[in-house]
Amino acid sequence: MIPYAGQTVIALVPEHYAAIERTVALLDGIAHSASYQAEVDAGADAGVRFEPGNRGVFMGYDFHLGPDGPRLIEINTNAGGALLNGLHTASLCDPERLACICADLLPIETMQARIVQQFISEFRAVRGPEAELGRIAIVDERPREQFLFAEFELLVKLFEQAGIRAEILDTEDLARDGQELPDLVYLRDKALLFDDQRSG
């Protein structure tokens, strides 16, 4: 069973979709403005001030629909569920009736390739345009106990089909002495500052 999955496709009215687009564009602009970054940097440690040059593959803006339209509930820099929800929604799509929704999800292989390409693009934004992504680690605290572990497994298969070695690691196992480090970490752990002993 897919988390959050239902059997009904909910279509947004154009005004609500436009409101979401405007809000996301506004927030993205603010987050990358010099004045906002200076404000955040003033009270932050070196890990927060580090600017890797990439935007984030699964930067997520969680909107809930209500009587007055969409309301922003959460901004998530490492959102999960894109692959699972994409596959589920694609299974409900009727291209003849819902062409606007289905265009980004069908064929499924195209959607999957876009997800892989996002990770490659993020990697190259930091390492250079010709860099090869050879190994990726999906990292979380006690990953097998996580709500979206099924998606971790699907992502491993997806990366491996694209010729990228992939594995699921516990946060505390990521940087053991003598262990080969991955080229890229998809960090699902919510301890983003790595400020406790297990992620130090």
Residue map of PLM features:
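Conserved metal-phosphate-binding beta-hairpin within the catalytic cores
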Residues: V48-A79
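Domain-scale recognition of functional cores that engage charged ligands
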Residues: G66-P67, A82-N85, A90-G200
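Short coil-to-helix leader/linker segments, especially the first N-terminal amphipathic alpha-helix
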Residues: A42-V48, G53-R55, Q161-E167
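Low-complexity, highly charged intrinsically disordered N-terminal segments
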Residues: M1-A46
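Residue-level signal for well-ordered alpha-helical segments
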Residues: M1-Q7, V40-A42, P52, G69, ...
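Short, solvent-exposed beta-strand-terminating loops
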Residues: L27-A31, A79-G86
